[in-house]
């Protein structure tokens, strides 16, 4: 009997490790493909790398360490949150020398958001390896765009080591950006959720002339990634991309509640162990708010009453493949919170913070629609022509 149990245990263990190995092999990142090609694309060139802690191969080895060992790495460039991803959102990052490589790490989230000619001196090729989250307001894609522009201006080739979009390649949601509201949190005229990998977006930025000067662009494609994959399907380990994106599912919650959290009044679980996974405000009744949310069409999303001190609202559980329009869900939550709050959320929010809200939204239209009492379903439906047009326009830039 003991032998039979041992055999069963061995079979189960083998099955477990086989499944684990299969999951790990599901997707090869751009950096993995570059490694398999013996870094031939970068050999004999002085390399500048735009990266942070998310720039790593599928085994977790940092891209900057790999390029230091196998190529001539001469400069690093870091986005919001810094080289280690620990700085708070919106906080300026200082340039410093990286202890791990001995290479200077120039901050692109300080006095400048774009590499200066001095920062690019002695660089033959710029390489981008950052993990994005698939949402327009997350600034890593803005950093990519500014670096592409600098590369074009200085006639430096630009290489993107591609990575998965953690919310998948099929989800396209939200309004575009009005020209006067383009900013570092809305750098490109794309929907709030774009469904592109960074490599595909780079191709679109170049092809649509969204920078002042196009660059000589190469995308090192992934192997094994498909548009229907969310992060959990890739078999890859998630490296927190910033302090409040600790898990591979965090981008889903960021999309749903992050926009509302730009206003004064709403609480979205920050600081805390579950950022973006709850939403509420003072004197909001958790039961009635949750009952309202359960009455809307949000397949794949569960709501539970949530209270913390005087804050009332709901906690969210979002399935990675939830069909619900998560940006639209944010409008429902914003509308109901605004209805239950006095004075309304927009009057509570001071000028500079309200300005950030408009920039994240891409204009003042969401404020206007909510204040006018336009039903959320009508607001969300008004986005569809833009979403459909974007799907058609982006098609020629897709790689997967």
Language-model regions, residue ranges each:
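Bacterial N-terminal signal peptides
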Residues: 12-21
């Amino acid at each position: 009997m003991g032998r039979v149990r041992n055999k069963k245990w061995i079979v189960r263990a083998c099955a477990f490790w086989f499944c684990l190995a299969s999951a790990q092999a599901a997707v090869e990142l751009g950096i993995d493909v570059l490694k398999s090609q013996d870094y031939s694309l970068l050999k004999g060139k002085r390399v500048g790398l735009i990266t942070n802690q998310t720039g790593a191969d599928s085994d977790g080895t940092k891209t900057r360490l790999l390029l230091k060992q196998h190529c001539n790495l001469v400069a690093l460039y870091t986005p919001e949150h810094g080289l280690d991803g620990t700085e708070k959102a919106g906080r300026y990052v200082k340039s410093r020398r990286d202890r791990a490589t001995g290479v200077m790490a120039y901050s692109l989230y300080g006095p400048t958001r774009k590499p200066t000619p001095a920062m690019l001196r002695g660089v033959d090729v710029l390489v981008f390896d950052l993990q994005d989250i698939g949402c327009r307001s997350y600034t890593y894609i803005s950093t990519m765009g500014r670096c592409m522009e600098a590369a074009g201006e200085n006639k430096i080739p630009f290489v993107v080591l591609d990575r998965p979009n953690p919310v998948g390649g099929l989800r396209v949601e939200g309004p575009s950006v009005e020209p006067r509201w383009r900013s570092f949190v809305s750098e490109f005229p794309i929907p709030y959720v774009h469904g592109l990998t960074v490599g595909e977006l780079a191709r679109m930025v170049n092809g649509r002339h969204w920078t002042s000067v196009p660059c000589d662009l190469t995308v090192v494609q992934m192997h094994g990634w498909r548009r229907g994959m969310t992060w959990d399907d890739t078999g890859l380990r998630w490296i927190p991309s910033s302090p409040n994106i600790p898990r591979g599912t965090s981008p889903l919650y960021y999309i749903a509640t992050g926009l509302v959290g730009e206003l004064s009044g709403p609480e979205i679980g920050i600081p805390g162990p579950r950022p973006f996974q709850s939403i509420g405000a003072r004197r909001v009744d958790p039961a009635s708010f949750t009952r309202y949310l359960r009455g809307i069409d949000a397949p794949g999303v569960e709501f539970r009453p949530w209270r913390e001190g005087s804050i009332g609202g709901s906690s969210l559980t979002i399935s990675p493949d939830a069909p619900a329009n998560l940006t639209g869900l944010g409008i429902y939550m914003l509308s109901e919170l605004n209805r239950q709050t006095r004075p309304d959320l927009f009057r509570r929010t001071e000028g500079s913070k309200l300005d950030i809200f408009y920039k994240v939204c891409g204009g003042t239209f969401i404020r206007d629609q909510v204040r006018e009492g336009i039903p959320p379903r009508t607001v969300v439906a008004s986005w569809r022509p833009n979403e459909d047009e974007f799907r058609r326009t982006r098609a020629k830039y897709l790689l997967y």
